[in-house]
């Protein structure tokens, strides 16, 4: 009778590593063109003025300036960069 015994704990203790998502540059912070402002999955925050969005929804600065988080409408946020 081939039974497997004592294998329970060897199948546990696996987890995926964190994806390092989130806000990288906060409101009022100075950024240079190309700096990443937010890494996100989907468009939790939308691109505003002077920022671009990558194919993985990463928001980055297109010009040198200061980051400003704003409301796009009642339930959507956007982030913009304004020149110094």
Swiss-Prot record:
Keyword tRNA-binding tagged: no
Chain segments annotated as coiled-coil in the UniProt record: none
Record keyword Ribosomal protein present: yes
GO CC annotations on file: cytosolic large ribosomal subunit
GO terms under biological process: translation
UniProt entry keywords in alphabetical sequence: Ribonucleoprotein, Ribosomal protein
Superkingdom per UniProt: Bacteria
Family annotation (Pfam families): Ribosomal_L27
UniProt GO MF annotations: structural constituent of ribosome
InterPro entries the UniProt entry points to: Ribosomal_bL27, Ribosomal_bL27_CS
Family statement drawn from the similarity comment of this UniProt entry: Belongs to the bacterial ribosomal protein bL27 family.
PANTHER family: LARGE RIBOSOMAL SUBUNIT PROTEIN BL27M, RIBOSOMAL PROTEIN L27
NCBIfam families: L27
Name of the protein this chain belongs to: Large ribosomal subunit protein bL27
Lineage of the species this protein comes from: Bacteria, Pseudomonadati, Campylobacterota, Epsilonproteobacteria, Campylobacterales
């Amino acid at each position: 009778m081939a039974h497997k015994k004592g294998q329970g704990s060897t199948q546990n203790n696996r987890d995926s590593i964190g994806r390092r998502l989130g806000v990288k540059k906060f409101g009022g912070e100075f950024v240079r063109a190309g700096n990443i402002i937010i890494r996100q999955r989907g468009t939790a925050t939308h691109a505003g003025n002077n920022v671009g969005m990558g194919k993985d929804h990463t928001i980055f600065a297109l010009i040198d300036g200061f980051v400003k988080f704003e409301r796009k409408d009642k339930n959507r946020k956007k982030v913009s960069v304004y020149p110094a």
